[in-house]
UniProtKB/Swiss-Prot annotation:
Keywords: Ribonucleoprotein, Ribosomal protein. It comes from Shewanella denitrificans (strain OS217 / ATCC BAA-1090 / DSM 15013). This is Large ribosomal subunit protein bL17. GO terms for cellular component: cytosolic large ribosomal subunit. One of its GO terms (molecular function) is structural constituent of ribosome. PANTHER family: LARGE RIBOSOMAL SUBUNIT PROTEIN BL17M, RIBOSOMAL PROTEIN L17. The gene is rplQ. Coiled coil: none annotated. Belongs to the bacterial ribosomal protein bL17 family. One of its GO terms (biological process) is translation. SUPFAM superfamilies: Prokaryotic ribosomal protein L17. InterPro entries: Ribosomal_bL17, Ribosomal_bL17_CS, Ribosomal_bL17_sf. Part of the 50S ribosomal subunit. Contacts protein L32.
Length: 131
């Protein structure tokens, strides 16, 4: 029985799932909008939102925690210099999911996940093509 087990399995083992969400979190911090499946987007919120909350208080300890979760120094830098100050007054809800139809190959429901208040010039990055 899977009572009280939160999160989606997404037909992956735990290490694959962890690596996938780490890569997707780095992509959304870097590009501020990505295109992925609806299920992955909903699950990605659970990874990205705590990272941004962590970045609102710039300290060495928080930077080390963020690096441990992302393993990317460039992403940690952007989190603490741009995103943390941008969302300083917002108490949560840093991401938005916009459904965008079905994928051509398998009719999987697709969605854009973006950071709220991102600059309009940012172009969407297709994460599925990168995998």
């Amino acid at each position: 029985m899977r009572h009280r087990k939160s999160g989606r399995q997404l037909n992956r083992n735990s290490s694959h799932r962890q690596a996938m969400f780490r890569n997707m979190a780095c992509s959304i911090v870097r590009h501020e909008i990505i295109k992925t499946t609806v299920a992955k987007a909903k699950e990605l919120r659970r990874v990205v939102e705590p990272l941004i909350t962590l970045a609102k208080v710039d300290s060495v300890a928080n930077r080390r925690l963020a690096f441990a979760r992302t393993r990317d120094a460039e992403v940690v830098g952007k989190l603490f210099t741009e995103l943390g100050p941008r969302f300083q007054e917002r108490p949560g809800g840093y991401t938005r999911i916009l459904k965008c139809g079905l994928r051509a190959g398998d009719k999987a429901p697709m969605a854009y996940i973006e950071l709220v208040g991102r600059p309009e010039a940012a172009e969407a990055v297709d994460v599925e093509a990168a995998e």
